[in-house]
Amino acid sequence: MASSSFQKQGKRKDMADDSISFETSKRHRGDYRNSREASPIVRDGQDDRRKYIDRREPGKQPSRPQIRDSNTFGGAQPGQDDHAYAAGRSTSKPFRSRDLDLPSANELKNKIRDTKRLLKRGDHLPADVRIEKERALVGYERDLEIVESRKNRAAMIKRYHFVRFLERKAATRRLNKLLKQKKTLTESNPNLDKKELDFVEEQIYVTQVDLNYAIYSPLTEKYISLYPNQRRDKKTPEPDPEDSNIIRNNSGEKPPLWYTVEQSMKDGTLELLRDGKLGIGISGQKTSNNGPIAVLGRKNNETVSGSSVATEGDSKQQGRKKDKEKQHDVKKSKEQEGSKNSGPRRRDVHMDDQNNEDGDDDSDGGFFEE
C-alpha cells in the first residue's frame, strides 16, 4: 500500500516537474541506442549531405524561388508599366503566357482615365515624361482593344459552340458513310459505273468541305447552320434590308462562308480563317478597313481588327463636327439677338414670357428653333 502511494506521488512529481526526463531501460532500447537517435542509414545520408554543403562556396547562399505576381498592374509599381509601354515592350515576364499578360478591361480603363487626366492637367510635366505617358496611353488603348475583342470572341464561341458540335458530328457520320460506300463499290463490283463513282466522290468532297466549315468557320462571325432542323416552321423569314447580301440556308443553299472555306482548303489558310486574321466577314468577303493593326509592345501574332478602330475614330470625328455646328448656331443666334433690339421684338419676347408663365413650354424663345 505504501509502495503504491509512493509511485503515485512520484508520478505526480514527475508530471509537475518538466526538468525530469523519462528514459527507457537499456533492454528496451535496442542495441543500446537512444530512441531519439537516428539509424545508421539515415546518419550516413546526413553526413553525405553535410559534406556536400561544406564543399559549396563559403559566401554563397542557397537559392530560393521568388514568388512573382501574375498581375503586373497591381499598383505596387505603376511607373514600371508606363516605362515598359513607352519603350514598346511588354511588362510581363518572358515565361508568362500571352493570356496572363493583359489585365482586365476595367483595370485598363482606369489606367487610360488616370493617364488622360494627368496629361490634361499636367502642364508642369517635363517633355520626356509627357512623351512617355502619351506612348503608355497608346499601349493601354491598344490592349483594351485586344481585351474587348477577346471578350467578344469568347461570347461568340459560347453562343455557337453546341451548334458547331452537332454539325461536326453529323458531317463526320456522313463522311464515314460515304467512304464506306465508296469502298464497297470499288471492291465488290469490278465493272463499276464511272458516273456512280464520280457522284460518290463529289459527295465526299462536299461533305469534307461541310466538316471543315463546321470546324474552321470564323469564330468571330455568326454561324449559319448547314443542316437546319426540318421540323421547325417552314415559313421562310423575310430578309432584312441590312442582310440582303447574305444567303440564308433555309432552302438548302450553302452559306457564303462555305465557299470561303473551300478556297481556304486549297490555299492552306484554314487556321487563319478560323482565328479571323483574314478579315473575312459573314458575307464571305473582306470587310473594309479590317486589316490587322500592329500593337505597340506586343508580338506579331497579337493584332487588333482595324474596323473597330476605324469606327471609333469616325464616331469621334462625327461628334466633333456636331459640336462645332452647335457652337456655330449658338454664335449666329447671339449675333442676331444683339443686332435686333427694336420695340416689336421686345414686345414679342415679353409676350412669350407671359405665355411661358401660363404653362406653354412648346417654344424655346425663338432663337434655337429650326
UniProtKB/Swiss-Prot annotation:
Residues 354-370 have a biased composition (Acidic residues). Keywords: Coiled coil, Nucleus, rRNA processing. GO terms for cellular component: nucleolus; preribosome, small subunit precursor. Its main location: nucleus. It is found in: Nucleus, Nucleolus. InterPro entries: Efg1, EFG1_rRNA-proc. GO terms for biological process: maturation of SSU-rRNA from tricistronic rRNA transcript (SSU-rRNA, 5.8S rRNA, LSU-rRNA). The keyword Coiled coil applies. The keyword Ligase does not apply. Residues 44-59, 313-338 have a biased composition (Basic and acidic residues). Residues 132-189 form a coiled coil. Residues 1-107, 228-256, 280-370 are annotated as: Disordered. It comes from the Eukaryota. Involved in rRNA processing. Belongs to the EFG1 family. PANTHER family: RRNA-PROCESSING PROTEIN EFG1. This is rRNA-processing protein EFG1. It comes from Ajellomyces capsulatus (strain NAm1 / WU24). The gene is EFG1.
